[in-house]
Amino acid sequence: MQNRNISYWIKKCVIQSISIVILMKIIAWPSISEAYPIFAQQAYEDPREATGRIVCANCHLAKKPVDIEVPQSVLPDTVFEAVVKIPYDMQIKQVLANGKKGALNVGAVLILPKGFELAPADRIPPEMKEKIGNLYFQPYSSDKKNILVIGPVPGKKYSEMVFPILSPDPAVNKEANFLKYPIYLGANRGRGQIYPDGSKSNNTVYNASAAGTVSKIFRKEKGGYEITIDTQDGRQIVDIVPAGPELIISEGELIKADQPLTNNPNVGGFGQGDAEIVLQDPLRVQSLLVFFVSVTLAQIFLVLKKKQFEKVQLAEMNF
């Protein structure tokens, strides 16, 4: 009996320990969606510069097309869709951080007018939730709820993303007005070429740091190369190329300073887009509807009056 109790308590302790470990992992492990915009969020107070350039372009050097679709106009305190499209060839593979090839991921930053923000979960219609899927959006910062970020997420599944947006109500939010507003989009597919500290990733071209002759190319065990260049003044320069890019030079070759040593492995890129949306006054819409109804009724009465007049004329002619 005592052995059974000991066995029971051992099993209980083991199960509790495993549960605690799993719970700690879930809490401590950061979401992949939260990891992507951290560079821009930490380095820049505002993701859009005064020139209109979105700061993501500092790391993603190649330009690629993006598209955004929003309604022409919305009413106050209304949930609507902003559809972001990031097209690319689904068959291509990108260089991963370990030098291997893998699928592309995508990410986006959506800059809304002040007052517009991410729609609360309880305001999003079920059909819109189906379009959104498992995407997790977050504001750029606590004081910039009108700027939303997402990514990285699998490009094959989310090359088209639906952002649920809540429009402001000028009756409640005094900063909002019934006007036409711009919306700005920045979106990327694939990894960047430069890290925020200015260092290169392994997803870009590597150039020779000096002119001379390539005397030795050493392939490292974990991938990448050490390229020894003998300069004309007798010095030896060693350029390090990480795993990922492919060499396009060979031993004995005479090269110039800044000459590419590798191909450009980047297959992704960053793009910007914009759209306009009108925050429509409901009273104006009602007035417009009343006007259209009035015009329609007036036309109907004119037609009826014309037919009545024609009947009178016809009766007089017969008389």
UniProtKB/Swiss-Prot annotation:
Main location: plastid
GO cellular component: chloroplast thylakoid membrane
Signal peptide feature range: 1-35
Cofactor notes: Binds 1 heme group covalently.
Necessary cofactors: heme
PROSITE patterns: CYTF
Pfam families: Apocytochr_F_C, Apocytochr_F_N
Annotated residues for binding of heme: Y36, C56, C59, H60
Keyword Membrane found: yes
An example Gene Ontology biological process: photosynthesis
Record localization: Plastid, Chloroplast thylakoid membrane
GO terms, molecular function: electron transfer activity; heme binding; iron ion binding
UniProtKB keywords: Chloroplast, Electron transport, Heme, Iron, Membrane, Metal-binding, Photosynthesis, Plastid, Signal, Thylakoid, Transmembrane, Transmembrane helix, Transport
Record's bilayer topology term: Single-pass membrane protein
Subunit structure: The 4 large subunits of the cytochrome b6-f complex are cytochrome b6, subunit IV (17 kDa polypeptide, petD), cytochrome f and the Rieske protein, while the 4 small subunits are PetG, PetL, PetM and PetN. The complex functions as a dimer.
Family annotation (HAMAP family): Cytb6_f_cytF
Purpose of the protein: Component of the cytochrome b6-f complex, which mediates electron transfer between photosystem II (PSII) and photosystem I (PSI), cyclic electron flow around PSI, and state transitions.
Name of this protein: Cytochrome f
Source organism of this protein record: Physcomitrium patens (Spreading-leaved earth moss)
Lineage summary: Eukaryota, Viridiplantae, Streptophyta, Embryophyta, Bryophyta
Gene: petA
